[in-house]
From Swiss-Prot:
GO terms for molecular function: ATP binding; carbamoyl-phosphate synthase (ammonia) activity; carbamoyl-phosphate synthase (glutamine-hydrolyzing) activity; metal ion binding. This is Carbamoyl phosphate synthase large chain. The lineage of its organism: Bacteria, Bacillati, Bacillota, Bacilli, Bacillales. Mg(2+) 3 binds at residues 820, 832. The keyword Cytoplasm does not apply. It comes from Listeria welshimeri serovar 6b (strain ATCC 35897 / DSM 20650 / CCUG 15529 / CIP 8149 / NCTC 11857 / SLCC 5334 / V8). Keywords: Amino-acid biosynthesis, Arginine biosynthesis, ATP-binding, Ligase, Magnesium, Manganese, Metal-binding, Nucleotide-binding, Pyrimidine biosynthesis, Repeat. The gene is carB. Pfam families: CPSase_L_D2, CPSase_L_D3, MGS. Its cofactor is Mg(2+); Mn(2+).
Length: 1070
């Protein structure tokens, strides 16, 4: 069937900011789709609110709108651009929900816009829990016994009939938001209340729990001719009951018999045909391990996280082909880009095993509930490929960057029996390590199977790894054992620990017996057809399929799994760096292990190595490729941390030298450099012991900012106000010793300013200066950034440009650097310099039209800024105003405090752009999911130090018609200032308290600043959590509250009676 020529313009809806449950996989899908549609000659219009994505680059679509994905803004774009069709199935849950809203509001009919890929009826049948259940009943496919509920009473009657445990699944939500398994009435009340609030249609499915069944997924494709095929099937190691995004996954499935595989395959194809989906679809099934009984769990009628994993696991580009199918092409007409000879309807065949392990942010959120269930909690994931399950699993473990290079975690090994049992029976993010610890202590695989319902096959494989571990320890430096261990995926670092020698000695042993990995190709067809895919994985076998080309090459290190502090921004920079290397005439090679990202799309680089980012694994690639050098500036802290080890092994680090990187990151060296350059910084010193830290703090005066050196995302950073608090931090948050010093600085509560710059060693280009709305003390990644700076004098800007130029040249930076300053009056202090790409680089690149990672790479490769056409100094500022607003995933992470401070907590970001700051902020807030009410009630409960400032804010809220509620202390201060206020009871008082008002929806905005001390801290935590659970915006910084207020004031009008001159009435604004 030829592609459609009756449509010319297609609107692609992106997925918005990165949140838990919806990460970089949709940047990958959207980028593929836009390029695929342009390839077919269509005019592509894209809307997405996330500036940190490749898909929002101007080259990706004919028109790119970085605007909020809301009914209001998308409708405006449709009316302006008049697309013939929209493609919503590549923008995750956000895209699907937007399409449903546009349809319900009548916009699609009004503007005569067709929905491509999967029609809205099919989306409704898959997403609406009741319609889905009815369809399955029609098809004769079993679903767990269930009921649709819209309130708690309906939930009670279902439980009376079925009994506990039950699973709650809210309709039209992402990553199982609001869902969970309930074992008792208390859990039922909490989960159902939360689920109904989070479902846009106030609907949940309550179903009988089938926890313990095997969970299997099929990634399927179908075209308009009803051709359907399976791209990949995947098996969750964890049984049903743990969200698939939080499960360890293996592809292809390892424990299904042929009969089981074919049974579930047939079901998946039957469902995609019944839904008449044109494109990709994910079917999740539960299989009884003791019979052939199965249940259909759910269907995602769109490209999903699993699609990205299936694409990378097989090499089959699902999103690219789904876009082609959406415009009428069929599977038997489109060539498979991997082989170039076969067509897309050939089902991929795998001659290797793929393991995916999720990455969690619990290192950032120590208070979070780590227990896994049906609501997703992982921020990202890693993937590894091997010839066996054991090899793939161990490669994935060392890709995680959780301080383990093997199935060995100190915490698990040292756990008492009670903790060990709890961690095994009630799964948390680190259960894999506790299973290994239990096997080491002599528990049998049958005992573990009984407790976990994990298939005996996987437990047997784990036990084999532990057995091999024991033989390694018993046979130091034995050649045969070494070879066996390497084939099983053991790392040199772990072997070195076993044999009590250093890692280099292991390498020398391997070199002596020529024991090195070879690289195999991912080709979708298990070598049945000729393939030229430049996509490789390592394994210990005979034949090597990766050959070095005659062209000089450069290796770029990726940033690994997405986590808080190191997100998709670094992947964005990696991809741009690769393109720049290719433009400069070199072969560009990527090493990375994240299946969600654009950088691991094999069509991006000349060669892709899907490998752990460890010294050993990277060195193997370097040895085979012999590159000109390695670029580490764009892979976040992951890549920077490898630079030292690589340089010691004789590898050329391109760009800023290792010594100069160390001068920026090592506190003492940095202080000396600042002294020479005569640039001020807040007073502070390095401490290598608790006593030393107390002395430094006493000398410079409290409050102080304390943090470990060499850190990304403000890990373990805190503002400390007393000696007692400092002692607590030093003993609990960090392991301080001479090797790992702690930095103690005077805390300057000024205005924070951030600068990204590019230096060629002589000239320095500053694309822009961004100011933060929140004052210093809130992590830069969690602050609202504004460009161009609105509150800085010309003198301060000149000082910042001068300091930035001096720092870049004085530290011999070649490439990118990011500097954070704090401005106090007209004084400018340097807080820190990062000699690498930053998380603001994509934002600044988009708005200044200076492709920073691209330019920096050209400079790293030896060109200079003037020859590249750039004038040194500050680039001319744009007329429009741009804001970068952080986005948080607090709703997914219960028991995490939402208060902002020096430790980063946001998972993503959005951009707002307009002609005034207020309009740009409005777009930013709306895009981030903040509900902007033009009237309502503001609840104020602030610390004593903030009360004076809160009076001014309350006056302004009152002036535009808001009612003010406050707790006793804050209310007294407001009454003294003659501001109308209703006093509410604190938590623990007998009558109706402020928590009741929040729960009953009587509050529209909460402003709550941190009080130090135990009780108020606990109360504040509960206020903030209740606000998040009930979807109420909560500001823990008065600066954020003021920004929201500015927006509300700009949307209100003056109202004054005509006879105001007779009796002076106060003005009211609405």
């Amino acid at each position: 069937m030829p592609k459609r020529d009756d449509i010319k313009t297609i609107l692609v809806i992106g997925s918005g900011p990165i949140v838990i449950g919806q990460a970089a996989e949709f940047d990958y899908a959207g980028t593929q789709a836009c390029l695929s549609l342009k390839e077919e000659g269509y005019r592509v219009v894209l809307v997405n609110s996330n500036p940190a994505t490749i898909m929002t680059d101007a080259e990706m679509a004919d028109k790119v709108y970085i605007e909020p994905i809301t009914l209001d803004f998308v409708s405006r774009i449709i009316r302006k651009e008049r697309p013939d069709a929209i493609l919503p199935t590549l923008g995750g849950q956000t895209g699907l929900n937007m399409a449903m809203e546009l349809s319900a509001a009548g916009i699609l009919d009004e503007c005569n816009v067709e929905v491509l890929g999967t029609d809205l009826t099919a989306i409704k049948k898959a997403e609406d829990r009741e319609a889905f259940r009815d369809l399955m009943n029609e098809l004769g496919e079993p679903v767990p016994e269930s009921d649709i509920i819209h309130n708690l009473d309906e939930a009670y009657s279902f439980v009376e009939r079925i009994g506990y445990p039950v699973i709650v699944r809210p309709a039209y939500t992402l990553g199982g938001s609001g869902g969970g398994i309930c074992h008792n009435e208390q859990e039922l009340i909490e989960t159902v209340t939360s689920g109904l609030k989070l479902s846009p249609v106030t609907q949940c499915l309550l179903e009988k729990s089938i926890a313990g069944f095997k969970e299997v997924e099929y990634e399927v494709m179908r075209d308009a001719n009803n051709n359907a095929m399976v791209v990949c099937n995947m098996e969750n190691i964890d049984p049903v009951g743990i969200h698939t995004g939080d499960s360890i996954v293996v592809a292809p499935s390892q424990t299904l018999s042929d009969r089981e595989y074919q049974l579930l395959r047939d079901v998946s194809l039957k469902i995609i045909r019944a839904l008449e989906i044109e494109g990709g679809c994910n079917v999740q099934l539960a299989l009884d391990p003791d019979s052939y009984n199965y249940y259909v769990i759910e269907v995602n009628p769109r490209v999903s996280r699993s699609s990205a994993l299936a694409s990378k696991a097989t090499g089959y580009p699902i999103a690219k082909l789904a876009a082609k199918i959406a415009v009428g092409l069929t599977l038997d007409e489109v060539r498979n880009p991997v082989t170039g000879t076969t067509f897309a309807h050939f089902e991929p065949t795998l001659d290797y095993v793929v393991a995916k392990i999720p990455r969690f942010a619990f290192d950032k959120f120590e208070q979070a509930d780590r227990r896994l269930g049906t609501q997703m909690k992982a921020t990202g994931e890693v993937m590894a490929i091997g010839r066996s399950w054991e090899e793939a699993l161990l490669k994935a473990v060392r890709s995680l960057e959780v301080g383990a290079d093997h199935l060995l975690l100190e915490e698990a090994e040292n756990a008492d029996e009670e903790t060990l049992e709890r961690k095994i029976c009630f799964p948390e993010d680190d259960r894999l390590f506790f299973l290994a610890a239990a096997l080491r202590r002599g528990q049998t695989i049958e005992q573990l199977h009984e407790k976990t319902k994990i298939d005996l096959f996987f437990l047997y494989k784990l036990s084999k790894s532990i057995e091999l571990e024991n033989r390694v320890k018993e046979n130091p430096q034995n050649e045969a054992i070494l070879a066996e261990a390497k084939r099983a995926g053991f790392s040199d670092a772990f072997l070195a620990t076993c044999w009590n020698i250093d890692e280099q000695a292991i390498y020398d042993l391997r070199k002596a017996q020529n024991l090195f990995p070879v690289y195999k190709m991912v080709d979708t067809c298990a070598a049945e057809f000729e393939s030229t895919t430049p996509y490789f994985y390592s394994t210990y076998e005979e034949e090597n399929e990766s050959t070095r080309s005659a062209k000089e090459s450069v290796i770029v290190l990726g940033s690994g799994p997405i986590r808080i502090g190191q997100g998709v921004e670094f992947d964005y920079a990696t991809v741009h760096s690769v393109w720049a290397i290719q433009q400069a005439g070199y072969e560009a090679i990527i090493i990375n292990n994240n299946p969600e990202t654009v950088s691991t799309d094999f069509s991006i680089s000349d060669k892709l190595y899907f490998e752990p980012l460890t010294l050993e694994d990277v060195m193997h690639v370097i040895e085979i490729e012999q590159p000109l050098g390695v670029v580490v500036q764009f892979g976040g802290q992951t890549a920077i941390n490898l630079a030292d080890g690589l340089a010691k092994r004789g590898v050329k680090i391109l760009g800023t030298s290792l010594e100069d990187t160390d001068r920026a990151e090592n506190r003492d060296a940095f202080e000396k450099a600042l002294e020479i350059l005569q640039i001020p910084q807040p007073a502070g010193k390095t401490a290598t012991s608790v006593e030393e830290a107390i002395k430094v703090a006493t000398d410079i005066g409290y409050p102080v900012l304390v943090r470990p050196s060499y850190v990304l995302g403000g890990r373990a950073m805190e503002i400390v106000e007393s000696e007692e608090a400092l002692k607590h931090y030093m003993t609990n948050a960090v392991k301080v010793n001479p090797k790992h010093p702690v930095l103690v600085d005077r805390y300057v509560s000024g205005q924070e300013v951030e600068v990204d710059a590019i230096s060629d060693g002589e000239n320095v280009l500053i694309p822009g200066i961004m100011e933060h709305i929140e004052r210093a003390g809130v992590h830069s990644g969690d602050s609202i950034a504004v460009y161009p700076a609105q509150r800085l004098s010309q003198q301060v800007k000149n000082t910042i440009v001068d300091y930035t130029t001096r720092l870049a040249t004085g530290l011999n930076i070649i490439g990118m650097l990011n500097i954070q300053y704090v401005v106090d009056g007209e004084e400018v202090f340097v807080i820190e310099v990062n000699p690498r790409s930053s998380r603001t680089a994509p934002f600044l690149s988009k708005i200044t039209e200076i492709p920073m990672a691209n330019v920096a790479t050209r400079v790293i490769l030896g060109e200079n800024l003037i020859d590249l056409g750039y004038t040194p100094g500050l680039a001319p500022e744009k007329q429009e105003i741009f804001v970068k607003v952080p986005v948080f995933s607090f709703a997914k992470l219960r028991s995490v405090d939402t208060s902002l401070g020096p430790e980063m907590k946001s998972t993503g970001e959005v951009m707002g752009k307009d002609v005034t700051l207020e309009k740009a902020l409005y777009k930013g807030f709306v895009a981030s999911g903040t509900t902007m009410h033009d009237y309502g009630t503001v609840l104020l409960t602030v610390a004593d130090r903030d009360k004076k400032e809160a009076v001014e804010l309350a006056k302004r809220f009152n002036r535009i018609g808001f009612t003010i509620m406050a707790t006793k202390g804050t209310a007294s201060t407001l009454e003294e200032a003659e501001i109308p206020v209703s006093q509410v009871k604190k938590i623990g008082e007998n009558q109706e308290t402020l928590i009741d008002y929040i729960r009953n929806g009587q509050v529209t905005l909460v402003v709550n600043t941190l009080t130090t001390g135990k009780r108020p801290e606990r109360d504040g935590f509960q206020i903030r959590r209740e606000s998040v659970e009930n979807g109420i915006p909560v500001c823990t910084s008065l600066d954020t509250a003021e920004a929201i207020l500015r927006v509300l004031e700009s949307r209100s009008f003056e109202l004054e009676s005509m006879n105001a001159s007779e009796v002076k009435q106060p003005k009211v604004r609405v």
